[in-house]
Regions:
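Short, charged beta-turn/beta-strand-edge "cap" motif at the junction between a beta-strand
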Residues: 97-98, 146-154, 160
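Non-DNA-binding regulatory cores of transcription-related proteins
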Residues: 81-146
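Helix-rich terminal scaffold detector
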Residues: 1-67
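Long amphipathic N-terminal alpha/beta scaffold segment
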Residues: 55, 59-99
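Sparse recognition of residues in long alpha-helices and their boundaries
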Residues: 37, 73, 155-157
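Charged, alpha-helix-enriched surfaces in structured cytosolic catalytic cores
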Residues: 5, 9, 16, 100, ...
Length: 160
């Protein structure tokens, strides 16, 4: 999977999430303002709870829109064996057992997994602790991470 395909996959997933959260926010807003939701007494908080839910859904939709804007504006730099890890890099890490992980350094949507025939690609952001460790490293550099609750040493195998 090329980096352009990765970004296209992220954008498609974010667009689907945006549609879902926008619809959920609209539904929660209608529930909060519906006449049957008006409180019967001072202990009836149904409308208040629905309004909190609507606001949360709207906030999440706004965050997703910001992520979409960031990915649509993302420049995908070319890397070589001397290039340090930075935003837009597809990094392959190897651990001491020989297993490899591929990470895409993106501006948002950290934690998203994209399926590929060569194995999952996980999006991480420069703001994450692991992303902060990766930034500036070169092929052959080592870093420490946590996996399944134990410390694991990784080596940067490639930066594309």
């Amino acid at each position: 999977m090329t980096k352009k395909q990765i970004v296209a996959g992220i954008i498609a997933r974010l667009e689907a999430d945006l549609a879902l959260f926008t619809a959920a926010a609209l539904h929660a807003h209608h529930a909060a303002t519906h006449e049957e939701c008006q409180p019967d007494n001072k202990y009836d908080t149904t409308a208040l709870e629905a309004s909190y839910l609507a606001q949360g859904q709207a906030n999440r939709a706004r965050e997703i829109r910001q992520g979409l804007d960031a990915y649509r504006a993302l420049c995908l730099p070319a890397f070589d064996d001397e290039s340090p890890v930075r935003l837009g890099a597809l990094v392959t890490l190897g651990d001491e057992t020989g297993c490899e992980r591929r990470l895409f350094i993106g501006p948002q949507a950290g934690g998203m997994k994209l399926a590929d025939v060569a194995g999952d690609i996980v999006v991480i952001t420069p703001a994450s602790p692991f992303g902060q460790q990766l930034l500036g490293l070169n092929v052959g550099d080592e870093l420490q991470g946590m996996e399944a609750g134990k410390r694991t040493a990784y080596t940067v195998v490639s930066v594309v």
